[in-house]
Amino acid sequence: MGGNVLPIHYDPKTVKQLTKEITVASCIGAAQGALFSIASALLLRRFSSVYRNVRTQVRVFYHCSWISMGAVFRADKQLLKFQTNYYREEQKRREKIMDEAAERGLFLEDESLNSSRSTT
């Protein structure tokens, strides 16, 4: 079968852009999670006798949990934004191709608009 044909979203440029956006979003989310964990830990230390008496490992786990949760949530949100923008651009590209074909008097079906990349 056609093992050398890849969908358009496997384009190295698209993957590189997505990787960059997710990395930046993860770092921002991790920083936000760290700020929240530090602020909440200070409040817990002040007002909670249970938190004051837990071991260091539990406190480290608490901070790591908030940092990783912030990174994951922010990265997921950025992925959804990227996906929305990607599909919007793809729809614009398809509409442009259809308009150009209509001006030339050509008939195109939707299947012919799907961009595929050949790896050869």
From Swiss-Prot:
It is found in: Membrane. Disulfide bonds: none annotated. It comes from the Eukaryota. Keywords: Glycoprotein, Membrane, Transmembrane, Transmembrane helix. GO terms for cellular component: membrane. The keyword Cell cycle does not apply. It is a single-pass membrane protein. The chain crosses the membrane at residues 22-44. Glycans are attached at N114. Its main location: membrane. InterPro entries: Rcf3. PANTHER family: AGR244WP (PTHR39153:SF1). This is Uncharacterized protein YBR255C-A.
